[in-house]
């Protein structure tokens, strides 16, 4: 499963990993969008390596997690040098520690580790299935509300159960950066740009898009305010409001 950054659709097809393994490929999963929002089972996915970041799951910035098959990690060389990643050092050579220490050189980010652990415990207490259900509820509200604004085009599935609580969209006649500025003035934070997915935007025939992200703490009233601010931005630049 992977929740794509831009179109926010959930890809759960186990065949992808099987096809990759049939030709000897290593399956690397970027799960930064998925892990905070739904149950993820690395074994069921068929992943060889899976990575995600801390700041998308209520944790701090500057820290992430890499899970990997031990046999694969054991074959990989270190990418940084420093304390803890060395086993034995001689003038003529050295050997490296076993994973995970081989990949954790130097002083670890102690405060970030502690904070990420607390965040993970909190999410585990809430329950990932419950979070996924809440994400679907919020997505449904956003899709319905944004769909009522003239000129708004949703990117990705319009079925809330097929996506997360993040919705990307465009507004006819309004550049995302302009809409973002107007909405910011009304206390609504969205992202405008290509969201690290420029090739996808080119594929869709658009230069950039807006992205509204919700999470378990988002309220229905905040979704209503988002929709109202999008409608206001469109009216500001091209005129016309929702009926």
Protein language model regions, located:
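Active-site C-terminal subdomain of aminotransferase-like
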Residues: 58-62, 67-134, 140
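Conserved small-domain helix->loop->beta segment predominantly found in fold-type I
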Residues: 104, 123-175
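Single conserved hydrophobic/aromatic residue that forms the stacking wall/gate
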Residues: 1-11
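Hydrophobic beta-strand scaffold residues
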Residues: 27-28, 154, 190
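Alpha-helical scaffolding segments of alpha/beta enzyme cores, especially the outer helices
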Residues: 15-18, 22, 118, 137, ...
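PLP-dependent enzyme catalytic core of the Aspartate aminotransferase-like
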Residues: 112, 117, 180, 185, ...
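Catalytic PLP-binding core of fold-type I/II PLP enzymes
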Residues: 12-48
């Amino acid at each position: 499963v992977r929740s794509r950054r831009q179109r926010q659709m959930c890809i759960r097809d186990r065949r992808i990993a099987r096809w990759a393994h049939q030709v000897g490929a290593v399956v690397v999963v970027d799960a930064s969008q998925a892990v905070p929002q739904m149950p993820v089972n690395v074994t069921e996915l068929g992943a060889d390596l899976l990575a995600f970041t801390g700041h998308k799951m209520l944790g701090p910035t500057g820290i992430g997690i890499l899970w990997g098959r031990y046999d694969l990690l054991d074959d990989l060389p270190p990418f940084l040098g420093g304390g803890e990643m060395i086993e034995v050092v001689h003038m003529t050579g050295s050997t490296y520690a076993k994973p995970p220490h081989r990949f954790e050189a130097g002083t670890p980010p102690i405060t970030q580790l502690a904070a990420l652990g607390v965040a993970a415990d909190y999410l585990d207490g809430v329950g990932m299935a419950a979070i996924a259900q809440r994400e679907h509820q919020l997505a449904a509200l956003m899709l319905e509300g944004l769909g009522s604004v003239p000129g708004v085009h949703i990117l990705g599935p319009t079925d809330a159960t097929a996506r997360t609580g993040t919705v990307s969209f465009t507004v006819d006649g309004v550049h995302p950066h302009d809409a973002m500025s107007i909405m910011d003035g009304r206390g609504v934070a969205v992202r405008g740009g290509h969201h690290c997915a420029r090739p996808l935007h080119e594929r869709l025939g658009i230069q950039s898009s807006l992205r509204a992200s919700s999470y378990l703490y988002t309220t229905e009233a905040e979704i209503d305010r988002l929709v109202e601010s999008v409608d206001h931005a469109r009216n500001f630049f091209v005129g016309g409001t929702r009926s």
